[in-house]
């Protein structure tokens, strides 16, 4: 376990700040000592200090970050602390911890000083030049006790930085609650994500959005906050030195000097497209001249440089995360390149949502009228972002070993037409191989998660991690067959019948009865062949009643009128359900109910924070307790918020939801049978 420690002790004995140690500061303040001198010589309202730490500017060529500080606020009131996160660092809760994690107190030393990073980004497909941490201040790095991995702590909503542009540096309470809860929820489900440590209300601080709103600060942490947008910046700047610095930092510091790239299959295996008919639309996003074929031709890539391996690894990490999103029905809402993590983490929570119903075209982003970032488009959009990343790295991916060595030494003074052609062809080949590997990683991981959710043991994990061609072929074949025969037909049914997406899997895992109760020849309609409880997973009560009445009418020899064709559609779905159930039972026989449930329970969260639940909790604070939010001495009722946190971070274990705390909310939020359908599939704006 390790001995519990105070935050001050942890910072003095074991903290670091790797980003500022290895990378380049803006020349306005080029060292930690210069930044410390500003703090010691000028008070918080002095124009010199305000200009250096809190005034937007274009930073110097080659800069990766700028030193800055959290803006001092009149009042701070911690609302929620993630005990799970606290335990991962063996930290005790005390006043110093609360103050440092809110920005009220700032820790710095000769090797640590707060900073904000600079990056660019493709936003809704269009390039935006210098962006950066406009309201985020990075604090320090600490190792977590489980993996021994360094985690970078930062404050979101910490005030103006050199990268705030035209914004105010604030984060409203509404979006802060949403990010805190959802980031911890995704992590607890098993979806790669950044984390949250503390949520702090800022009484007396408001932000003008559509209306004036109360503000908050979220302390969050991750192994790295570097995004693809950090690399977009250096392509735009034509800054090779800065690009190499950033790439080397990622390889050495984030991926253990490249040792994490080991154990992958021969890259040339992915000259073959193992999923040529995939519906993830990746093929449409591969920018090349030739028509896509199932197997690439041409010479193999003989050796991979560390930059090739780096690109390949980032592709795989992101493919894995998107597979989790699609399997669990998580819609990100905004997937710009500056919202795409170099480590494949779910990052920068905005207008996100879990699907209430399976609707692939749904976007939780009210402002995404073209549905660029719809649920169905997420795999292809992430691949599009990765292609921009390939362009950022092109000058490092294109050269063969000898030319790359000259480039890194600064001795590749010119590139003739022949070398340029060779370099372009090599980058194109790497991108094509990566496209096929992206589809392979995405589809096999997606099939593996979906099979678990359905209680089916496909035994894919071993093959997925193998470097053997036969194992890779086997994994691809099993994944494709499972998706074609089981997953896609099921999703078609769920999309048509519009039952709750997540709870369908819960109901199926808990079902112990017979799937069929009669042969179809013994019933008036197909409806009578099914167990009604089983059908209740696929249809709502109104649809079930319609089908039951039709069954009775046919049995009595009465005519049934179907004026709007609804009964015909229901009967078509019944036929599809029968076919699907028969296929499903070949994988999980009815006699294996216990084994099916045991496997599924490990992959099916009993609760996911829906948009309407988050809105209820936000409204409880923002409207029911409006006056108290601005009074630092008021006692706020945070019981609903704490209940939501407990349910979100313990998605597989109802016993940890604390039955003594607002027990009525468990039924209200987790059992949706009595909920108003109008609450579902809510959208949010980008305003935060």
Swiss-Prot record:
Which cofactor does this sequence's record say it needs?
Mg(2+)
- Which domain of life does this protein belong to? Eukaryota
Per the entry, what span does the transit peptide take up?
A: 1-23
Q: Which GO terms of the cellular component aspect does the record hold?
A: mitochondrion
**Record's keyword terms, sorted:** ATP-binding, Disulfide bond, Magnesium, Metal-binding, Mitochondrion, Nucleotide-binding, Nucleotidyltransferase, Transferase, Transit peptide
- Which effects follow disruption of this gene? Reduced growth and survival in presence of oxygen reactive species.
User: Any idea of its EC number?
Assistant: 2.7.7.-
Positions annotated to bind ATP: 132, 134-135, 156, 168-169, 220, 227, 348
Query: Its Gene Ontology molecular function terms?
Result: AMPylase activity; ATP binding; metal ion binding
Q: Where in the cell is it found?
A: Mitochondrion
- What family, per the record? Belongs to the SELO family.
Q: What is this protein called?
A: Protein adenylyltransferase SelO, mitochondrial
